[in-house]
């Protein structure tokens, strides 16, 4: 018997395998090697046992550690504004204590890094005019986003609550509220230590990790957690017995035997696609739209249900690898250097590497990897073409090209449907895209209304505001664009957030996704 949404013979993955792969995608955005968060989860569970935590708390520790930084990609746009390369600064932040002079020195060294001196001084002035307030706002947004995304992918309320304390410190000098001591859930106190300890042990060795733990005892970390960790630290940090860190980490999962139904998997891949799209404001709703277009085009081409299902899932997951490329590149308004362009071209390969972790999604992985390949071999990452690309790969490539054209990019405005159609036809005539797949994508796109419904909850002006906020515009930029005062914009934003129950840009973006407003929000002016 098969579950809802399951096709006969379909070998579906376990829940923890999908979430484990998601953690590898999170590693990409942290600038850490694959399996960092998985290994941190293993360390955290071992530490939980040393502390005598009951099973239900250890379960929360596991998933809180595994997806601890799920919110970091949602605020990549903001990080890039302050620090330039969001991935590089996150990588380097692991090496400093986040308080006092060392952290101030770290901030000074990374604000607007790589920009001309005048621009650096301008950004520094803006940030340090109210450094605590600016960082608290950023951290609050991160924590709210992490909690929302955790629930969006089906994790427990306990995990969502724990993630709100990610940036707090035992000594009360953390953010966003300055919680201290036992005000911070023990699950987060354990997760924080495991996350940092894994990096220092892997990078500098056991002695350096031990010195780091002692120096931060009672400051960043709970003394009881540090003391438990430093009792035989070599055992706590030991590699998996057979060297398979993936297997070791998954064995600690509380629901390690839970296998997904097809319907549950579909909800999960949709949520993961939404999560990826939040990395850049201008890609909001991209993966959902691509999945819908590609699946409908596949049906029009006469594909069977299983092939269409694979195509739809590939549409949701095709851009996972974008998490491994800095927003500094995605937001570039000019030309990329050869090395920068090479990093961008790697993102489909990174998608493949992440999906390779999930049993039962081999077909999805193959199709998703090829979303930028061309029939004439001029695409990337492999440059394959012709018979090397199946019908599903060709259909996804056409759907991605069409949907991307409809969306704004930092270097161009969104195209009209007519302009997107001509762009697609041109690529078909040039031999890059399959003519039949292009025809199918354009046919199904032509049957869709040009604008999705508005939500009656919001006024037309609030719809405008929601669209601009979701696309990453600041209040000042919105005021300039709409010829309003900043105070008026701020009032509109506050009313809109109150109406939709959001507290930040990510919450507003998710609301727009869940209520079918994204096509309207991405319409060109």
Name every feature range the model reports, one short phrase each:
Residues 400, 420, 465, 469, ...:
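Hydrophobic, well-ordered secondary-structure elements that form the walls
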Residues 277, 467-471, 513:
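Short, locally clustered residues in the helix-turn-helix/winged-helix DNA-binding domain
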Residues 473-507:
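Recognition helix of helix-turn-helix DNA-binding domains
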Residues 191, 396, 466-467, 497, ...:
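Hydrophobic residues on short alpha-helical segments
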Residues 498-525:
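Basic, Lys/Arg-enriched C-terminal extension of HTH/homeodomain DNA-binding domains
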Residues 2-457, 463, 519:
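Histidine- and acidic-residue-rich, metal-dependent catalytic cores
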Residues 458-459, 469:
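Conserved acidic segment of CheY-like receiver
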Residues 204, 280, 472-473, 503:
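Short helix/strand-capping hinge loops at secondary-structure junctions
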